[in-house]
């Protein structure tokens, strides 16, 4: 192609407008860059079609645009699909976000939510920020301070999703990491014999992996006395946000897959000064990082300059308020995550059979498993009957994902699997229609 034959930016953008429903500014930018790339390729002797470049790029962008999907993977808290289905998302156009209706003056953001959380878990005070990594960053910066020394077991120097590592987060917060113990064995004496003084003691629940065999650690129940002997506050990062290890909202008591999860209330009862946890994992709420504990420590966190950079907005406040009100009123079992997690296998089997029959698809009902997900309860699953679709794994998966709305299934061992435990019953008809179109 001669460079003089390349289309104008407006002409190419106009052609793309008929295929892609995106703002014209994005069409113009994409067209201009595609033409520039095509011109360079032509001059180097490898001509390419700018229309093809632009279309490929817009297809990729369009597929990444936020949209609703049906999660049929069986991973209940699927990080890539938004984790916990949330409640209470209706937010008025204007609200009393930071307005005191009694005095007509500026109020404190999240005042009701903070009081609700504290009373629900039995803490003196509470604070909510944008996510749990942010809560930990803030706790370290506020309670240990710049150049403060923070002791943590080597076996808990975790890496979370996206290659974010605890030592890096600690360094960014301005504190110095004091490693104690070994990867597989840490004792209380390792903390108390660490050289020098420490400004805080941190314990992190390894919620996304499991270490077995010749191991030893200091349980949450013993850490407060260790920290007290060092004259330092104890920060407990329990991660997944299980409010009560007894799970009183689950009929018949806590299921086996919760056996190793620390409870927020129990960790507070042990004497932790600050307990940190996520809002969108086992709690079943929106993305948030929650800090509960002693009023003095929480106030220091709230007054730290970085707290403003981590604060939450109105929709998050509304959703998290609805979530904690469900716990406070004894209605936690109705939260979408717990409804999915505790649904009897027989109910899932009945729904799956009905979907299979309605779709007319050739598939088999087999024994399978669901995962709580979101880096919680590693290695533990929930028994679940699933629909197995054999043959042409990629074709089946792609067909479901191309449906509107997309139905996201699991795929492995040459087959696609549809797991209705992670699907709301109201979406069963969507799954059936998607299966019928394979």
Where are these regions (language model features)?
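Conserved C-terminal alpha-helix-loop-beta "cap" of PLP-dependent enzymes
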Residues: 349-431
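Long amphipathic alpha-helical segments
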Residues: 1-61
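A short linear hydrophobic-aromatic micro-motif
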Residues: 65-66, 125-127, 277, 405-410
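Conserved PLP-enzyme active-site core in the AAT-like
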Residues: 105-314, 318-326, 356, 434
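Glycine-rich phosphate-binding segment of PLP-dependent enzymes
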Residues: 31-32, 36, 72-73, 82-104
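Long amphipathic N-terminal alpha/beta scaffold segment
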Residues: 44-86
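Conserved PLP-dependent catalytic core of the aminotransferase class-I/II
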Residues: 316-317, 321, 325-373
């Amino acid at each position: 192609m001669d460079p003089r034959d390349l289309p104008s930016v407006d002409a190419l953008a106009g052609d793309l407008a008929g295929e892609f429903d995106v703002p014209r500014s994005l069409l113009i930018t994409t067209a201009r860059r595609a033409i520039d790339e095509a011109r360079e390729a032509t001059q180097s002797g490898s001509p390419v079609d700018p229309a093809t470049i632009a279309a490929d790029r817009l297809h990729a962008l369009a597929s990444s645009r936020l949209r609703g999907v049906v999660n049929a993977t069986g991973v209940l808290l699927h990080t890539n699909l938004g984790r916990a289905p949330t409640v209470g998302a209706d937010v008025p156009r204007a609200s009393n976000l930071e307005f005191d209706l009694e005095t007509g003056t500026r109020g404190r953001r999240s005042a009701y939510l903070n009081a609700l959380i504290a009373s629900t878990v039995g803490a003196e005070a509470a604070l909510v920020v944008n996510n749990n990594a942010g809560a930990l960053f803030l706790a370290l910066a506020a309670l240990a301070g710049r150049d403060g020394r923070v002791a943590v077991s080597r076996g808990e120097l975790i890496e979370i999703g996206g290659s974010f590592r605890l030592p890096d987060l600690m360094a960014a917060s301005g504190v110095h990491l004091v490693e104690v113990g070994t990867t597989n064995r840490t004792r209380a004496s390792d903390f108390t014999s660490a050289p020098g003084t420490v400004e805080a003691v941190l314990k992190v629940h390894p919620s996304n992996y499991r270490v077995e065999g010749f191991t030893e650690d200091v349980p949450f129940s013993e850490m407060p006395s260790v920290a007290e002997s060092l004259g330092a506050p104890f920060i407990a990062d329990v991660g997944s946000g299980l409010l009560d290890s007894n799970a009183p909202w689950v009929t018949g008591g806590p299921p086996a897959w919760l056996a190793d999860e620390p409870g927020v209330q129990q960790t507070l009862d042990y004497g932790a000064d600050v307990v940190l946890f996520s809002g969108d994992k086992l709690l079943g709420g929106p993305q948030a990082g929650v800090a509960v504990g002693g009023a003095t420590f929480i106030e220091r966190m709230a007054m730290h300059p970085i707290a403003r950079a981590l604060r939450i907005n109105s929709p998050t406040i509304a959703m998290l308020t609805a979530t904690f009100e469900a716990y406070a009123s004894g209605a936690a079992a109705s939260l979408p995550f717990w409804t999915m997690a505790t649904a009897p296998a027989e109910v899932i089997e009945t729904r799956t059979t009905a979907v299979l029959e309605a779709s007319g698809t050739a598939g088999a009902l087999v024994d399978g498993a669901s995962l709580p997900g979101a880096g919680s309860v590693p290695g533990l699953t929930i028994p679940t009957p699933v629909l197995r679709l054999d043959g042409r794994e990629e074709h089946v998966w792609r067909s479901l994902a191309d449906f509107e709305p997309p139905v996201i299934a699991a795929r492995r061992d040459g087959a696609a699997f549809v797991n209705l435990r992670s699907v709301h019953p109201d979406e069963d008809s969507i799954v059936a229609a998607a299966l019928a179109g394979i």
